[in-house]
Amino acid sequence: MYRYISFIWNAADPQATETAHFLQNTFTDMSSAWQTAYDGSGLCVLHRDEEPNRMQAYALSTQDENSGGVVVGKLLTRDRRPEAVSRNAHITVPEARRVIHTSGRALVEDYWGTYVAFFQRGPRKYVLVDPMGQLPCYKTGYRGVEIYFTYMPDVAACRFLDFSIDWPVIAKGLIYPVDHTRVPICEMTKIKSGECVTITPEGTVKTFYWNPQKITQTDVIEDVDEASRTLRQTILATVTSMAAPYDGAIDMIGGLDSSILMAALAQVPAPFKLTGLNSYEEDPGGDERYYVRQTCHHLGVPLIEHKAEVSRFTVHGDDMVPITPWPTDHCVAPTYKKFIHDRLTEIGGEVIFNGSGGDEMLYCHGKNYAVIDYLKTHGIRPPLFRLIMEASRMQQRSVWSILPSIMRDGFGKNRIEAVAAQPTSLLTAQVQDMVEAERQREEQTVHPWLEFRENVTPGKIDHIEPLIFGQYKREEAMVPEHFFETLRPYLSLPVIETCLRIPLWVLLADGKGRGLARKAFKDLLPPEVVWRSSKSLSGKYFWSYTLANLDKFRELLMDGELVREGLLDRASLEKTLNRDHDIELRDFAGVHSYVSAELWARKMKGETFADIVRSNVA
């Protein structure tokens, strides 16, 4: 598992300098695996478990005094041609100088990948996270030294660092979809995807160089055939670029997005070997084997099938689940991830490919945004009426029921739908007050990617919005022994930028979710797979798991940290999580996330796996 840790301090401060040297020695003494990637005046970067061409350090060597740095992660050269395969970067002295003299802008303009850059120019220090932020960057501090890191167990091992839970952030995550840009630990923050932090003796400034809104207005592709050809070329070239360092991989195949991904991976030249892995449930809504088998047979790819069995509630210890910056599943996911790791080892594979981000980037949503965007950019023209009919069919609603909102939003002020709350009767009234105060504080600062600028349309804001919340992140909730690298081509910069340049009504070609992607890859997949309309509803597995372990969950939660902090109502838990009581679906759906938050909170407060076992809940 590749990871890094960086220290930034004011080199003119003797006490901070002494502390920085103490921290460096602490980590190198803990393990000889920690190596120095960069050591400058007030900036030091350590890393470990480097694999050249996969995850490594790229030196920013300028040969100038007090100027230089390093990029950690995976960096590829940019080529604006959609069919061009990118190569692993090698940064020359002139290129390093350009990166540093542009305060990192050149890194975003000339390269792409999964990386964090640390560099300096005189007393100014910079931390730059790639636009997708899949290699996380967290920050804490100690005695005048800023500490940046990617894997929390590394800093948690330092007993002199104290961490405490930020309960309002936890509360918000129980009601709204989790925003991984906020860390529920008081002493930690997360550097956002695409954010550049400039640290000077006078203070800190945060900037975003990558501008997705501007991309939506640049070289727009409205012709369906051209868009289809460009999307296909980009996905094929990107997948080939990402697969290049590996000889074998598993594609986590299930839905249409991962089937298209498998079709692209099947084009990667030998000696690359591909295997499919499909996890299915007994419930028909969670079983996609009919389509998966067709795809694998058509492409000649061997398939591993894994049945998701409902198991007894078991809390896995630190040997399976490390301490994480956010609540994570301690029950089901660790065993499944170990299963994937073991299968990858068996076949001699080295990496997992995952279709995450396909729903959002290839665009599958049956909303009105495609019609609204067309109306705002083209006005009332003949294609508008076809688009209205397609939107009606996708939403399974009448034209007359969607037309008023289309007219209102098409001619009115730009806006997007607010994220809906998901409260349950198990939460206390205090939680809502806590969450509202937290939301009001957050709403004072709108993320620059979501501000209506650059003549951007509401649909393109909806297209961009999932990228800001950090939902797509490296598998940090894994111990190094079971770690496997996961690559997500749909969340790579070349694919994202291509999709952003294509209007939504073109992405929804033929009035179908991912319609353009279907058209682009229809010759590589069986027709039944290309034109399938069903999608797995895997949530029923967790309902079954919750029902099977209801007594243990009730016992765990009733006297737990979430009750003690006033987030969950003990009386409601006792009444609702009872097999003799009819449980509402909304209450049922939240229980598993409450259990994850409870176990995480106990671990954060110092409880060990053995403590939880002794409490008779595991």
What are these regions (language model features)?
Residues 111, 233-234, 334, 468-473, ...:
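Short, motif-level signal for alpha-helix interfacial/capping segments enriched in acidic residues
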Residues 95-98, 157, 445-454, 500, ...:
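Short amphipathic alpha-helical segments and their helix-coil junctions
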Residues 168-179, 462-473, 477, 589-606:
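Short, hydrophobic/amphipathic alpha-helical patches that form generic packing surfaces
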Residues 106, 163-168, 450-462, 512, ...:
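Structural motif
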Residues 1, 5-17, 123-137, 141-143, ...:
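ATP-dependent adenylate-handling active sites, centered on carboxylate activation for C-N bond formation
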Residues 1-311, 318, 325-326, 595:
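Cysteine-centered catalytic environments shared across enzyme families
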